[in-house]
């Protein structure tokens, strides 16, 4: 018998379980050995925008459980991906892992020291603890995206790319302005693997400008 709340509606956990069981990307992730269905989101983003070229140095922020890291190493190659998360994560073959909280003051320096030379791609699938209040959740994820962008502005090599998750809403004007100032091309994209009912979308910024061009010199 279906589990229901006092109001006769299915519990959130039951709805989540049914959604997982009926989700083709969940089944595909298990079949293909990916740690999460989110792997297909990055694969679809890269199929469209080609940011993960072989040999490019990549930082994957908020990497756990590792689905995006798996796709990144498949496409950029072994030895070119640094996975970063505030929580521990099972290692992904061919990558390095750094436990680091991006909210800490020394985070950018710590990540910069861990890099091997240039940085060509910054990925962020970071998401806040969802409250269910759309405006609050939107503000929180914009803050995470801004933190990821701040790291990119400090460490990204000219010509590099930035991919980050945002929630649809009206508070990301300053973020988009910064992206358009720092990158020659900025696009929004909702990959097919992103659930239709989800407010998430992704910003894909490409061809990072060098410092002089950013300042308008």
Predicted regions and their residues:
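Class I S-adenosyl-L-methionine
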Residues: 168-217
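A short glycine-rich, Lys/Arg-flanked "PGG" loop and its adjoining helix->strand segment in the class I
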Residues: 142-158
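S-adenosyl-L-methionine
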Residues: 84-131
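Conserved class I S-adenosyl-L-methionine
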Residues: 54-64
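Glycine/threonine-rich flexible loop motifs
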Residues: 130-141
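Short glycine-dipeptide loop
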Residues: 78-79, 156-161
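Conserved SAM-binding loop of SAM-dependent methyltransferases across substrates and taxa
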Residues: 65-77
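Class I SAM-dependent methyltransferase Rossmann-like catalytic core
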Residues: 2-54
